[in-house]
Protein backbone atom coordinates (compact mmCIF):
# COMPACT_ATOMS: atom_id res chain seq x y z
CA UNK A 1 0.00 0.00 0.00
CA UNK A 2 1.26 3.42 -0.87
CA UNK A 3 1.96 5.83 1.93
CA UNK A 4 0.14 9.12 1.79
CA UNK A 5 -0.29 12.33 3.75
CA UNK A 6 -3.87 12.69 4.99
CA UNK A 7 -5.07 15.63 7.07
CA UNK A 8 -8.39 16.85 8.44
CA UNK A 9 -11.46 15.73 6.50
CA UNK A 10 -9.34 13.69 4.09
CA UNK A 11 -8.03 11.67 7.01
CA UNK A 12 -11.54 11.11 8.38
CA UNK A 13 -12.82 10.01 4.95
CA UNK A 14 -9.91 7.60 4.57
CA UNK A 15 -10.65 6.12 8.00
CA UNK A 16 -14.29 5.57 7.00
CA UNK A 17 -13.10 3.68 3.92
CA UNK A 18 -10.50 1.63 5.81
CA UNK A 19 -12.58 0.81 8.89
CA UNK A 20 -16.02 0.50 7.31
CA UNK A 21 -18.88 -0.58 9.58
CA UNK A 22 -16.71 -1.04 12.65
CA UNK A 23 -15.95 2.65 12.79
CA UNK A 24 -12.82 4.19 14.24
CA UNK A 25 -11.43 6.07 17.19
CA UNK A 26 -10.70 9.66 16.19
CA UNK A 27 -9.73 12.17 18.84
CA UNK A 28 -8.01 15.27 17.45
CA UNK A 29 -6.67 16.05 20.93
CA UNK A 30 -4.76 12.77 20.97
CA UNK A 31 -2.54 13.47 18.02
CA UNK A 32 -1.41 9.92 17.28
CA UNK A 33 -3.02 9.43 13.90
CA UNK A 34 -2.48 13.05 12.88
CA UNK A 35 1.24 12.74 13.59
CA UNK A 36 1.32 9.39 11.82
CA UNK A 37 -0.76 10.26 8.73
CA UNK A 38 -0.74 14.05 8.35
CA UNK A 39 2.73 15.20 9.39
CA UNK A 40 4.23 12.01 7.97
CA UNK A 41 2.76 9.75 5.29
CA UNK A 42 1.10 6.57 6.55
CA UNK A 43 -0.17 3.33 5.04
CA UNK A 44 -3.56 1.64 5.21
CA UNK A 45 -2.07 -0.86 7.64
CA UNK A 46 -1.17 1.93 10.05
CA UNK A 47 -4.67 3.39 9.70
CA UNK A 48 -6.27 0.06 10.55
CA UNK A 49 -4.77 0.31 14.05
CA UNK A 50 -7.18 3.18 14.72
CA UNK A 51 -10.32 1.21 13.83
CA UNK A 52 -12.61 0.18 16.69
Curated annotation (Swiss-Prot):
Keyword Disulfide bond: yes
CDD domains the UniProt entry points to: IlGF_insulin_like
Entry's localization field: Secreted
Pfam families in the cross-refs: Insulin
Major location category of this protein: secreted
SUPFAM superfamilies, alphabetized: Insulin-like
InterPro entries membership: Insulin (IPR004825), Insulin-like (IPR016179), Insulin-like_sf (IPR036438), Insulin_CS (IPR022353), Insulin_family (IPR022352)
Disulfide-linked positions: 7-38, 19-51, 37-42
UniProt KW keywords: Carbohydrate metabolism, Disulfide bond, Glucose metabolism, Hormone, Secreted
GO biological process: glucose metabolic process
Segments passing through the bilayer: none
Any Gene Ontology CC annotation: extracellular space
Function: Insulin decreases blood glucose concentration. It increases cell permeability to monosaccharides, amino acids and fatty acids. It accelerates glycolysis, the pentose phosphate cycle, and glycogen synthesis in liver.
Family in the record: Belongs to the insulin family.
Subunit structure and binding partners: Heterodimer of a B chain and an A chain linked by two disulfide bonds.
Protein name: Insulin
Species name: Amia calva
Gene name for this UniProt entry: ins
Amino acid sequence: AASQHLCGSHLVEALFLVCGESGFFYNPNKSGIVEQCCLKPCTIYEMEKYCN
